Amino acid sequence: MSENRRVVVTGIGAITPLGNSVSDTWENMKNGKNGIGSITLFDTEKFKAKLGAEVRGFDPKEYLEVNEVLRTDRYAQFAVAAAQQAVDDSGVEGNVEPERFAVIFGSGIGGISTFETEHTKLIEKGPRRVSPLFVPMMIGNMAAGTIAIRHDCRGSVMPAVT
């Protein structure tokens, strides 16, 4: 690091089990909601756990073109949507040096739904049926990279996988 600089958060966005925007999430938190409900994203018949905190009512096509939706894992779709909300919320307009914009994005694991889908294809149909986009869609840094490309951020781009 050549010099110390301040970091300024100019906007926020949120895709959560409590809502698909900051305002919806905040209102539901204030009203004591927890976002927990019956799991719908997979069959829970063989599991003891039947409850989870899923994001509901999210339409990735509100933020991505159809071809982008097809080649982007759900976790990255959430990230792109929240980042777009944050950019919109920021009110930043005009000529801003792309080198001064950074993306630091945290996730728990990356594209686990892509991993599951492609693993099933591998087992049931063989390696030739696995998507060539398998690795790019599931890696933990795909969300940060996609956000950076969409918003021409040329500063640091760092995934924080916990």
Name every feature range the model reports, one short phrase each:
Residues 159-162:
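Short beta->alpha junction loops
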Residues 1-157:
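Conserved "HGTGT" condensation-loop signature of ketosynthase/thiolase-family condensing enzymes
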